[in-house]
Amino acid sequence: MPIDLIAAGQVLHRVHRTPLDPIFFGPGPGIAATNRFDSASGRFGILYVGMSRRGAIAETILRNPQRLMVSMTEITTRAISELSCIRPLRIVRMHGTGLQALGTDNAVSTGPYEPCGLWADALWDHADQPDGLAYQSRHDSSEICLALFERSDMAFDRKGMLPLSGILKEIAAILEVYGKSLSPVGPV
């Protein structure tokens, strides 16, 4: 199995609702799978992070490619946190060369969600006990994101949290790369 090691202390990026804790393995007990790699069986939660700030922002805020403007509400209600695991993470590479080694293709990053939850369950149960998987961002194929499995020995340090509204210049620059801009009012 193609497993990459992410060193303890490596900064990972998470965009989340401002009042909520950035460390959340969802979707939560009794809630049906809603995101790409959520466990199909519901036996464990998933924490979604980006390897870069830009990747985390793309996966969270740029979910509608047809919209040329991002609502300020999307910005004012969210923050970005830097997290780092206190131990190394063993991550299954579900992108690039890892796809062929696993016998799949990039539909795991762009296709229907249902098979992805089954992949998460299978990898969770695998004898190698990986901590999660790395996948190509659906909203920016140059970015790699992680779906981390809820494991009892996984703990994170919080390196910092910034409201997205506090880094508007950086957010605007990132959005410009994608040909988008900020809307000064509600949803557009």
PLM ranges: what are they?
Residues M1-R36, R67-V188:
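Active-site and NAD+-binding cores of ADP-ribose-processing enzymes
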Residues F37-R67:
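Extended catalytic/binding region for NAD+/ADP-ribose chemistry, centered on the ART fold
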